């Protein structure tokens, strides 16, 4: 299988070139988790994959608790369905705590102090959903002084411990609520089963991909990623490309569009962030700075061919720019991609 075939299958498996999903929460569960550090762009990542969806549809799913937002992998914010949150946290949180241990120390956040703060937060959230600023004030009233930065790590700790997650937006303000309002704590956890489950979810929705890609996306160690891959059933296949082994779930070719399509990709989309090796969709002819590595991609045929920009206050003005202005591309397809983005944001 060559690079073009890999791109074609990835776009199909990630539900970008085609999909049968109609509900935001169905898509999120299929993907396992969707990076959501850029909140507005994360909502567009859902809209990109489900035709005729609007931002109001995604907001409604979030407000109803069908999708929640929390630190989950690597670590950064992700969209996830509540029922998947606890078993994934049980798998990934210990590794994340180790990775950010130096930050805990930097802000003098001992385990005792963080548990005390989270107990105060948990008690406060029983009554009502609260913003970060409101929670920080309550914690301070109880005698635990923090800075804006240190309190961010307390919130992160609370999310990793399965105590809190996103609640219903209060206007443009993010609020927090108890995860237990959506899903009960785990009564049992078998690590090997969770590894297998996450590997199956990843390679089904993002294959063809390598073990290294899986480890990069999940934040798990290479050892754990390999173990998870060993649990893949015989339904999965593998092949070698440039000396690397790729795993995927074979798909009926009738359901894989031959045309990879043209899309305005959101920042930090799963099509890019899911893979450690990005050479398959990065054109070496075009210099892409680290700042641009996950920003505003104009994707043509599964390759990054340019960038796009829009005015948040005036979506009628969307500008696209090709890295190579002389390159022949389907301008109608670009106009359609712009129209899809604008349609998603119509109120």
Where does each model-flagged region fall?
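Phosphate-backbone binding and catalysis cores of DNA-processing enzymes
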Residues: 1-133, 138-141, 145-147, 285
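Short, hydrophobic-biased segments on the C-terminal half of alpha helices
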Residues: 58-59, 152-156, 226-233
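A short, conserved structural fragment
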Residues: 63-72, 76-77, 159-169, 233-241, ...
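Short, amphipathic alpha-helical interaction segments positioned at domain boundaries
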Residues: 88-103, 180-201, 205, 261-272
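Positively charged, polyanion-binding regions of nucleic-acid-associated proteins
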Residues: 111-128, 191-207, 229
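Loop-centered beta-sheet repeat module
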Residues: 148-225
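Non-catalytic regulatory appendages
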Residues: 231-284
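Glycine-rich, small/acidic residue-mixed loop/short-helix segments
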Residues: 284, 288-347
């Amino acid at each position: 299988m060559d690079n073009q075939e890999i791109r074609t299958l990835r776009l199909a498996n990630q539900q970008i070139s085609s999909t049968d999903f109609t509900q935001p929460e169905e898509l999120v569960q299929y993907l396992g988790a969707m990076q959501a550090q850029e909140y507005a762009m994360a909502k567009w990542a859902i809209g990109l994959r489900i035709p005729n969806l609007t931002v109001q549809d995604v907001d409604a799913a979030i407000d109803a608790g069908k999708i929640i937002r929390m630190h989950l992998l690597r670590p950064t914010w992700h969209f996830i369905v509540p029922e998947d949150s606890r078993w994934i946290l049980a798998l990934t949180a210990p590794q994340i705590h180790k990775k950010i241990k130096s930050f805990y120390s930097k802000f003098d956040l001992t385990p005792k102090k963080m548990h005390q703060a989270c107990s105060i937060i948990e008690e406060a959230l029983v009554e009502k959903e609260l913003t970060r600023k409101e929670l920080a004030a309550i914690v301070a009233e109880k005698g635990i002084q923090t800075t804006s930065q240190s309190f961010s790590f307390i919130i992160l700790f609370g999310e990793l411990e399965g105590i809190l997650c996103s609640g219903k937006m209060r206007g443009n303000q993010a609020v927090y609520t108890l995860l237990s309002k959506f899903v009960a704590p785990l009564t049992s956890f078998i690590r090997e089963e969770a590894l297998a489950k996450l590997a199956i979810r990843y390679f089904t929705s993002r294959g063809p991909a390598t073990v290294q890609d899986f480890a990069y996306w999940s934040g798990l160690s290479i050892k754990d990623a390999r173990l998870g891959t060993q649990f893949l059933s015989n339904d999965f296949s593998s092949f070698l490309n440039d000396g690397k082994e790729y795993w995927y779930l074979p798909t009926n070719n009738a359901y894989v569009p031959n045309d990879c399509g043209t899309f305005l990709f959101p920042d930090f989309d799963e099509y890019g962030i899911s893979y450690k090796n990005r050479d398959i969709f990065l054109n070496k002819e075009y210099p892409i700075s680290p700042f641009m590595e996950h920003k505003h991609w104009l994707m043509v045929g599964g390759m990054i061919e340019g960038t796009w920009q829009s005015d948040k206050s005036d979506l009628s003005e969307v500008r696209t720019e090709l890295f190579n202005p002389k390159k022949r591309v389907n301008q109608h397809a670009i106009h359609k991609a712009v129209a899809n983005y604008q349609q998603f944001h119509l109120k």
